[in-house]
Amino acid sequence: MYPGIHNFSEIGKLNKVLLHRPGKELEALTPATLERLLFDDVPYLKIAQEEHDNFARVLRENGVEVVYYVDEVAKAIADPARQIQLVNDFLNISKIHAKGLRASMTSYLLNMPPKQMVAELIAGIKRSEVATKEATSLMDLVEDDYPFVSDPMPNLYFTRDPGACVGN
């Protein structure tokens, strides 16, 4: 097998697959958050995990190498410089610009091992987890009823939705 991605058929033999095991991000789904998080129903985490585990087992039994999104991203950010870059990119994409909150989130995330950091980013970061100690700007003082500073990513367990590859 050659390194990299070489996908020339969507109906040929599957050799390797990237999956995400449903986690805490599904617990963020409530009737109030369904529309915002692009879901139609609130899945039951334990059942979703059991179904996922059975699916992954069947894939392995059929010779498919199963790799997990969290593990692969954690490997990619093993270098502390890459962790800093990921956190900065994540905060920018999430439009988190309030200085106090940004500093709190940066400290919160960079004090985790890479795998835990990735899992937390996917689960969504609650305001209560990164309360700013001191307001450094007007933005830090703005109240919001939404419990998350960054949205959870429940759609990630449909791993083909955020990305697909054709060719190499």
Where are these regions (language model features)?
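The feature marks the mature, well-folded catalytic cores of soluble enzymes
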Residues: 1-168
